[in-house]
UniProtKB/Swiss-Prot annotation:
Native species: Escherichia coli (strain SMS-3-5 / SECEC)
GO annotation, biological process: regulation of ubiquinone biosynthetic process; ubiquinone biosynthetic process
A Gene Ontology cellular-component term: plasma membrane
Protein name according to UniProt: Probable protein kinase UbiB
GO terms, molecular function: ATP binding; protein kinase activity
Chief localisation class: membrane
Domain of life according to the entry: Bacteria
UniProt keywords, alphabetically: ATP-binding, Cell inner membrane, Cell membrane, Kinase, Membrane, Nucleotide-binding, Transferase, Transmembrane, Transmembrane helix, Ubiquinone biosynthesis
Matching HAMAP family: UbiB
Family assignment from sequence similarity: Belongs to the ABC1 family. UbiB subfamily.
Localization terms from the record: Cell inner membrane
EC number assigned by the record: 2.7.-.-
Amino acid sequence: MTPGEVRRLYFIIRTFLSYGLDELIPKMRITLPLRLWRYSLFWMPNRHKDKPLGERLRLALQELGPVWIKFGQMLSTRRDLFPPHIADQLALLQDKVAPFDGKLAKQQIEAAMGGLPVEAWFDDFEIKPLASASIAQVHTARLKSNGKEVVIKVIRPDILPVIKADLKLIYRLARWVPRLLPDGRRLRPTEVVREYEKTLIDELNLLRESANAIQLRRNFEDSPMLYIPEVYPDYCSEGMMVMERIYGIPVSDVATLEKNGTNMKLLAERGVQVFFTQVFRDSFFHADMHPGNIFVSYEHPENPKYIGIDCGIVGSLNKEDKRYLAENFIAFFNRDYRKVAELHVDSGWVPPDTNVEEFEFAIRTVCEPIFEKPLAEISFGHVLLNLFNTARRFNMEVQPQLVLLQKTLLYVEGVGRQLYPQLDLWKTAKPFLESWIKDQVGIPALVRAFKEKAPFWVEKMPELPELVYDSLRQGKYLQHSVDKIARELQSNHVRQGQSRYFLGIGATLVLSGTFLLVSRPEWGLMPVWLMAGGLIAWFVGWRKTR
């Protein structure tokens, strides 16, 4: 470790101890050397004894800075790792930091645009940022080419070395977790950090976010439910993104939405429909749909439309994952726990040798109490959480795409019930899921698959004769090879039989000669000739094996 890393690690540990976070480690795991090390190098009393543990963890992460704040936000979605009182506190972490100098942002924009001054591309550039976060900040301007209002998102200068340094230390701490916590190995801390690293590094590349936004906008073009602002790719680079400026009501501002006459029931239901459309129709979903990234258009409040921003984190599911997920939901709400267990095994989410009966019993034990509530109050996100937590006891591997899905679903549910507390998520989602599953099977699905593949087969038609000829030639060559191998095996079998025959005769002659040499010395050279014949037979048998 470099001196800088040692200093930073020392500061991190002192911060954790000042908030009494050593309480997370069972006393039996704190050995005498560790205790001496703690009191000699890190004498730091808990200065926040009056606060609950979850709040202390949140405050410590806030003190450690942006990288740790975002790490805490990610951990808040992994409710399989923490009890609710800690996960709820981590969810309160706010990614708000002081803005960096607008002049620096202006310099970065000019560097990204080939060294030309900002005024060559933009009018009314606002040096004061509109918003600021740990990774980037946003400035407003107008495009010189068409006068449209835009926002310019710029990555913080020199943020990458800071992120890499702190990630290296987070990895070090993650490797200590299995040694300090009894359940540490099951939590797979290194995998959790690796997942966070990928998400964070992806957020540093604004070209990726631009592509995500363009894709989502295309998927919901002319949709009455969701609007994604236009991105101007000619102005985008890894460190800068330019997109249409939008005006909307923050989805968390319920009072303003009601004052504007918004149809709250329809708005809440559309949030659910948008989510399931992204997941099951498009296989591409916005995975950071917390209230800060969602607005509602001022226009047509009786027919409300969402506006989504900040598309840095997206998720996708393959066709099999979508089918298993939809069938899991329907089987769960039908209380068919056997089907749920079988789907987990069939999907490969749990090992194929899993005992289905035991797994079914475990799912029933955990999930049956959920139905004590009315269906309208059951949370899809918590259903998934309960299923995944149970499956992890049966060695379910961490599925990053499903973790993202569960996190997003919790956001969608939270927003929906904040807007309209009577929202019946199951009633809204069930027709969509049943319709989607119906579309995946039967004759319509077969016809659709044929239509999708038809251009491919039309393109390959001229190549078919050659492909058939090649297949026949390869088949003939394969048959010739198989016949050759069969003949060699038969020949080896015959040689081995002959070898065993000669070795048996040789052994008999040698033993007979030895016996006669000892018991019948009057027979003269006869025993010697028998032994010599036996050795010759042995030699012939040995040669047959080669």
